[in-house]
Design a protein with these regions (language model features):
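Predominantly late transmembrane helices and immediately cytosolic-facing juxtamembrane segments
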Residues: 3-32, 48-52, 288, 294-301, ...
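Transmembrane alpha-helix boundary signature
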Residues: 50-62, 74-79, 165-180, 197-217
Length: 539
């Protein structure tokens, strides 16, 4: 049941505002299970068209050539003491008036240090962007800086937020979801193992002894947004238990991909930075043990964790998963306390002595009651759930589409057949389209045969095979691993990305077509309570 079923609508005497009416189509689209996949597909198409059009040079310039620097400058002594130090600072020859205060001078000094870094070590003092006022530091070298292309910032920093969401989903599933029960978890776990082993073996068979062998982890991945989106578009033909199975399988698959990235695609480890990262994780775990539920503190601690993981040589996105593992999963108050305190607040709200038409902001009693209800609602939701709920739309509709735009722009030089004749491309296509469904079906069959798992109610083996084919939609995670595997080999990287797109497209069409031949799923029994309002009335 959607959370939005409890939002008051016209049926409750609430007339939609003009802005709400305009936003309604977008809100309804965002509620669709397939919406994330549709946006992802659209951005992929834009990237491909852009990279192969007359504007291809601008695509490469924006994402690969443009460098962005984040820097922390040395702060001058006088910024702290309030006195200028002539041994450290030289007067600007263009400066005719020294009327700016010390705080502005400090800001200008920091700005010059950053400008100096971006200029790649250019000698001399740069002109001040505010007309040359203030003092200039003799030494412009910043205390710390990181300079990367736009694509690298997206892949290393922005995707860490996506992996935080993935980590939260994994933790939730393990604690209270399908993976919490060993019996229910067995089938998706075995399916995911088969879906990782099968593609990897096929890739190795075509690339053993070749320079492309490092890409063996590419076809192991499954894109949840695409695969689940296609299942959702098939509607009533698909039993809900199959949707749960594929989602759980993809989550276990993501966990396997994270292990592969951390273990096999990490080259030079810096143990000191790894130790710093471990210390922060230990502090976060201790905060969890102490029942600290201040979400902001966890997220702030995630920033140095990201930096230390990045500097350690392990891929920086692993920091998102580590942070997710430490987020508290238990609420501050239980359901009984929530109901009691909220009813009390509602009684205060209903029995307020003000005129019923008085605005809440003008009534101290009602304002206090609403504040109490908001506070109770926050305490009854675990921090894990609150962060996941807040970040999921950003991951689905902002981060992943931006990632697709920055990484799916593959210039096709020569014919498509020529590009796909690369052993890496062959291994990826066959691994995703053949190895995925074969591995999933075989290990699921073995798990059922030996009695440690059973098919969900309403799910047939044709459903399992169809879902396995949809598991061959690698896309996001596959492209991510390809960037790591062929980071120093642009030619093979382009071939690998093209192969991922081709294999994902074939898997989507074939899997959807097979599932369309399945009998419609039986209608679910109506909810004993049912929604308070109809979906069509949601705003």
């Amino acid at each position: 049941m959607s959370d939005d079923h409890y939002i008051p609508t016209a049926k409750h005497g609430l007339t939609p505002e003009p802005g709400e009416r305009l936003a309604r189509p977008l809100q309804r689209f965002a509620k669709l299970s397939s919406s994330g996949g549709i946006v992802l597909l659209l951005m992929t198409a834009i990237a491909m068209i852009w990279a192969n059009s007359q504007y291809a040079e601008s695509y490469n310039e924006i994402f690969n050539e443009t460098k962005t620097t984040i820097a922390v400058a040395h702060m001058p002594d006088h910024a702290a003491s309030g006195h200028d130090d002539p041994a450290t600072y030289a007067a600007d020859p263009h400066d005719s008036e020294h009327t700016e205060d010390h705080s502005e001078s400090a800001i200008q000094d920091a700005t010059h240090a950053i400008q100096k870094t971006v200029a790649d070590g250019e000698d001399g003092h740069a002109e001040d962007s505010h007309g040359g006022h203030g003092w200039k530091p003799v030494t412009d070298e910043p205390m710390w800086y990181q300079q990367h292309s736009t694509a690298m910032w997206i892949n290393d920093l922005l995707m860490a937020i996506f992996f935080l969401v993935v980590g939260l989903e994994i933790k939730r599933e393990v604690l209270v979801g399908e993976l919490a029960s060993p019996k229910r978890a067995a089938l998706p776990i075995f399916g995911a193992l088969g879906g990782m082993i099968g593609p990897a073996l096929i890739f190795v068979a075509f690339n053993y002894g070749k320079e492309t062998i490092g890409g063996w982890g590419i076809p192991m991945a499954t894109d949840i947004a695409f695969a689940v989106g296609i299942l959702a578009m098939l509607g009533k033909r698909i039993p809900n238990s199959l949707l749960v199975f594929l989602t759980s399988l993809a989550i276990v698959d993501d966990l396997g991909a994270l292990v592969v990235i951390a273990v096999f695609y990490t080259e030079n480890l810096e143990l000191a930075y790894l130790g710093y990262a471990g210390t922060i994780v230990a502090v976060l775990m201790f905060m969890n043990v102490l029942r600290v539920r201040w979400i902001t503190l966890y997220l702030v601690m995630g920033l140095p964790l990201w930096y230390f993981v990045y500097m350690s040589g392990v891929h920086a996105t692993i920091a998102g998963v580590l942070l997710a593992a430490t987020i508290p999963a238990h609420a501050r108050v239980n359901a009984v306390n929530f109901v009691f305190s909220t009813r009390k607040a509602l009684d205060v709200f209903a029995n307020a002595h003000d005129d019923p038409e008085t605005a809440v902001t003008e009534s101290s009693e009602r304002r206090a009651a609403v504040t109490a209800i908001m506070h109770n609602s926050r305490l009854v939701m675990p921090p894990l759930h609150r962060i996941e709920h807040a970040l999921h739309p950003w991951a689905a509709f902002v981060i992943i589409p931006i990632f697709a735009l920055a990484n799916a722009g593959i210039p096709i030089h020569g014919g498509i057949v020529e590009n796909l004749s690369d052993p890496a491309a062959i291994g990826i296509i066959l691994g995703l389209f053949i190895g995925k469904p074969l591995g999933i079906a075989v290990l699921c069959f073995l798990a059922c045969k030996i009695g440690i798992a059973a098919l969900p109610k309403g799910v047939s083996w044709r459903h399992i095979i169809g879902a396995g084919i949809l598991g061959g939609i690698g896309f996001t995670m596959a492209i991510f691993i390809a960037n790591l595997a062929y980071a120093n080999d642009p030619s093979h990287l382009e071939h690998a990305k093209l192969a991922i797109l081709v294999a994902s497209g074939i898997s989507a069409i074939a899997g959807g077509a097979l599932l369309l031949t399945c009998k419609s799923a039986p209608e679910p029994e109506p909810d004993s309570i049912g929604p308070l309002v109809d979906d069509d009335d949601d705003d």
